[in-house]
């Protein structure tokens, strides 16, 4: 799947000159004990990108670059990046696609099919710049073999496996929740990973939250009991633009009710192409007690207004805030110890449903892969945090 020459010509025409801003950046490959492999002589496309990058207003962090390749991962806000002629997007969350707009014209964007559809319908990125890749299929992109693997994060999220001509293999996890299933991925089970870019969102021993399956079972149980005792209850699940779908899908399936969401969310959900999803969505909130709201809306004053907007059809509300940040060491894996917060006729449960790996899962994933080097991609701004994470990695790999 090589870049078409016609696209390159189009990029050349659309390039705009920007004021050059020079910033010094430490060679962090050295800081992490890595050698930055000397890439092969750049092709004409790379040279063009390198010249444009001279005017880039921000320096791209080293952990977003794939050494020995003209690739970056989730680095759109830094575009144009010097010597980068292909930009990879791991998934459709704003902190990863920031910098992408409908005017994007720097270079092709490689992502999964589902993410590609979201780029088009939500950000209106020109289809000519979007290169969708099938999960589990190997592609030759500029001489590098690239494979997308399911990341067990949000819909469309991918681990990206890069295999260089010199035999080196790199894995970028993007955001992911490590699972036993990943140990059966042929690429991960049979090939040594030389360099692992690791999602370290919860790389701290205090984060040992339960499995997604256990949390879903808890949420369904609470909902069932609540509706049995209070039939006129509206059930609200907080969610991101994409993400947390399994929470409300589990409730819907267990209770046999449809899902109400606004038109924008319904459009996004339908774009996933999941079997039966369209038939399971309601366009009228009066037809079902299960409603989806932005997770940022789960505040009592906002929920009170929402309840009042239902014109008396419901007399109480049960809401779920599903995020790993609600996890408490005191509760651990005993979800029955969770105490909801209530105000008037509204009850909110914070449940540790996370789409990122907990500390134990990170350890198991690293010990399964046994990579030569690990580069953390989250919480790396503080040298103390970096040092702690490196000590964890060393302990795991010695075991």
Regions found by a protein language model. Give the residues of each.
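Metallo-beta-lactamase
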Residues: 85-95
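Metal-dependent catalytic neighborhoods of phosphoester/phosphodiester hydrolases
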Residues: 98-104
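Acidic/His-rich, metal-assisted hydrolase cores and their charged scaffolds
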Residues: 1-86, 105-169, 173-399
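Short N-terminal helix/helix-N-cap motif within the alpha/beta-hydrolase-1
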Residues: 97-98, 181
């Amino acid at each position: 799947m090589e870049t078409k020459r016609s696209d390159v010509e189009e990029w050349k025409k659309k390039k705009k000159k920007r004021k050059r801003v020079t910033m010094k950046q430490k060679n962090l490959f050295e800081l992490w004990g890595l050698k930055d492999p000397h890439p092969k002589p750049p092709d004409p496309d790379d040279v063009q990108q390198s010249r444009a990058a001279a005017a880039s207003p921000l320096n791209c962090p080293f952990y977003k670059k794939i050494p020995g390749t003209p690739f970056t991962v989730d680095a759109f806000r830094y575009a144009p990046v010097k010597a980068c002629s292909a930009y990879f997007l791991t998934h459709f969350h704003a902190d990863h696609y920031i910098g992408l707009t409908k005017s994007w014209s720097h270079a092709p964007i490689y992502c999964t099919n589902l993410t590609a559809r979201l780029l088009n319908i939500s950000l209106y990125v020109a289809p000519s710049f979007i290169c969708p890749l099938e999960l589990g299929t190997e592609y030759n992109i500029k001489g590098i073999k690239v494979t997308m693997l399911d990341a067990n994060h949000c819909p469309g999220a991918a681990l990206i496996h890069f295999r260089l001509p010199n035999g080196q293999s790199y894995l970028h996890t993007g955001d992911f929740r490590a699972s036993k299933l990943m140990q059966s991925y042929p690429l991960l089970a049979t090939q040594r990973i030389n360099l692992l870019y690791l999602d370290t969102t919860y790389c701290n021993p205090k984060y040992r939250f339960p499995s997604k399956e256990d949390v879903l079972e808890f949420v369904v149980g609470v909902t069932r009991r609540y509706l049995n005792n209070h039939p006129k209850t509206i059930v609200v699940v907080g969610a991101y633009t994409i993400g947390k779908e399994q929470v409300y899908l589990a409730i819907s399936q267990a209770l046999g009710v449809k899902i109400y969401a606004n038109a924008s969310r319904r459009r996004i959900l339908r774009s996933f192409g999941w079997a039966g999803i369209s038939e399971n969505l309601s366009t009228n909130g009066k037809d079902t007690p299960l409603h989806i709201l932005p997770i940022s809306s789960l505040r009592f004053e906002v929920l009170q207004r929402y309840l009042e907007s239902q014109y008396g059809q419901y007399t109480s509300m049960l809401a779920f805030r599903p995020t790993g940040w609600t996890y408490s060491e005191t509760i651990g894996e005993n979800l029955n110890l969770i105490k909801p917060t209530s105000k008037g006729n509204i009850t909110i449960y914070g449940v540790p449903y996370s789409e990122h790996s907990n500390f134990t899962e990170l350890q198991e994933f690293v010990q399964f892969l046994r990579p030569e080097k690990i580069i953390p991609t989250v919480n790396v701004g503080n040298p103390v945090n970096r040092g702690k994470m490196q000590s964890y990695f060393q302990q795991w790999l010695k075991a």
